[in-house]
């Protein structure tokens, strides 16, 4: 069969944005913000997570050396995130 999923870009009127939003059956399921080297959690991820009740929130960082959770957001090296995809 497959999944009733969509991949979107998320931005509000004030300019807050998240690079990727995956929805399942029309509901927000996972948000992903991508950074080159910044491991401090992007405030937009927390804003949208709380506002839209997104269950899985990641900040994927190209140059990160370790995986950590900060305020409920998983900050993960890009190689680990991409390596976990099916």
Question: Where are these predicted regions, by residue range?
Answer:
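A cross-kingdom feature that marks ATP-driven nucleic-acid transaction machinery
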Residues: 1-86
